[in-house]
Amino acid sequence: MKKTALMLSAIALTISSSIQAHEVTLENVARDFADQPTKETDWYMSRLQKEIPVNTFKHNRIPSNKDHQFVIRENEDTMYSHAILDVTKSATILMPKYDEYAIVQVIDENHYTIAEVYPGQTLNLTPDMLSSGTHVFLNTRVAASNSQDLKALKKANEYQDSIKISSVTSNPYVSKGFSEKQVLAARAKVQKLRPKIPMPFDMFGNKGAVDLTSFVIASSAGWAGLPSDAAVYLPQIPGNTGSTECSSLTINPPPLQYKRHAFFSMTVYDKDGWIADDDFAISNKRMNPNQDGTYTFRFNCKGQPNNLDVQKGWSGLLRMYLPDSKQAIQNYVLNDYLKNAHLVKGPNIK
């Protein structure tokens, strides 16, 4: 009888431990899912390697939309070009000058952003710059002056073609063999913590420059985000409950390097982080400010300016490209946005 009781206690303890192991929290996510950034990166690199040869760009000629998206939580702000670059010995990225926003983000196999390249710059890559591995993922963003103007899109497409990459070696990227089912299952668990990210300024960056908990969550919730010197992402709209009723958000313009074609935008997603509607994004380039200089985004307010369509359980992501400085954008977020911006019912016409 005593032996049976001990066995039952052991079984109960095992079941309890199993349940706890599957409960993802801010306290355990960095420990239990430490390799998730590497798995996510391998998932994207393996998919791309099947589509194009190494050291070759795959250009997306139109902005992302509900029928055309490769990475979770993409946006309409820029057109993406993706490549896997072999850095076994050395490689080079060359970006000609351009009079709109553009950037090549260099991501190593562990999802660390090891470099950023802007128009007019050339970068020489060597293997010692990587945290590990021999290949990098190039996440290139090229903006048009107006994402809905065909002439502007053509100009941006021509610039995409002018970006040059080269490498001494051409070894294909070899998948690490992670189970896609396990990667996606872990992603579903980890990204539930997205609204609770503790350090939104340190979600992305190079090794040693990120907050590990924020980094692990963001790797699943918004893979290939830029470091805060290049962009800041606010993954939660204050007051948003995922309701589909007409609502609005008014903000002060953030401190950005507008002379370098900096801009800010709002993009909305479904409950899983994917683009689900036609009118899902807008940037300040296509908005008229209110009389007091503020900007108002509207959600499911048909017929109103700056309106975005949303579905039940939606989330919104405010992107701010090229902050004046890390200190300036932190001050804006903490002392302006989080204190003054709040989702309200109705179109809030000013």
What are these regions (language model features)?
Residues 1-20:
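Gram-negative bacterial Sec-dependent N-terminal signal peptides
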Residues 21-350:
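A compositional/structural signature for long, glycine/proline-rich flexible linkers
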